[in-house]
């Protein structure tokens, strides 16, 4: 990805969700339609991300979130913003994301770094990890677990409190590993 520091500079008062959306729209304008199709890329509209976040109500001092198809982090940002405004907001949020498009990682990192700064200003500790692999392929064995326990998820150091995701935007063949 080319360095466009003016694109990656947050505006004063900009919500992390708005920033991630803006960076995502810029990135989408730099890649071809076949590229977007290959990676199943779809920009989640901010109102949809906000609605999805509004459905989550985890309680506790720490929240662990999974975003298995992060993109630039619009869904994760919307969820973290929502949690930060909860009457009993968490003191710590840990986010594990998966993103297969390595060219998108600088934009993902920019969005999550801005989210971290935004949350720290609200006295919430924020950590994140970006896994550059396919969540389904990396966790196929656990996802096929007949017990439904997901006990073998690769990033499962401890259970997740919430997962936020769009469906995949490409068809997965039946014989896919």
Where do the PLM segments sit?
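SAM-dependent methyltransferase catalytic region
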Residues: 1-177
């Amino acid at each position: 990805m080319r360095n466009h520091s003016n694109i990656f500079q947050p505006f004063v008062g900009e919500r992390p969700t708005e920033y991630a959306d803006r960076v995502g729209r810029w990135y989408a304008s730099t890649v071809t339609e076949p590229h977007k199709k290959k990676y199943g890329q779809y920009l989640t509209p901010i109102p949809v991300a906000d609605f999805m976040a509004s459905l989550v109500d985890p309680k506790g001092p720490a929240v662990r979130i999974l975003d298995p198809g992060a993109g630039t982090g619009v869904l994760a940002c919307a969820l973290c913003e929502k949690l930060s405004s909860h009457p009993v907001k968490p003191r710590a949020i840990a986010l594990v994301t998966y993103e297969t498009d390595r060219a998108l990682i600088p934009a993902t990192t920019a969005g999550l770094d801005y989210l971290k700064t935004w949350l720290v200003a609200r006295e919430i500790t924020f950590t994140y990890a970006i896994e550059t692999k396919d969540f389904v392929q990396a966790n196929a064995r656990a996802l096929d677990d007949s017990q439904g326990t997901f006990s073998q998820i690769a990033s499962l150091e401890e259970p997740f409190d919430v997962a936020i995701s769009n469906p995949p935007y490409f068809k997965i063949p039946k014989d896919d590993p």
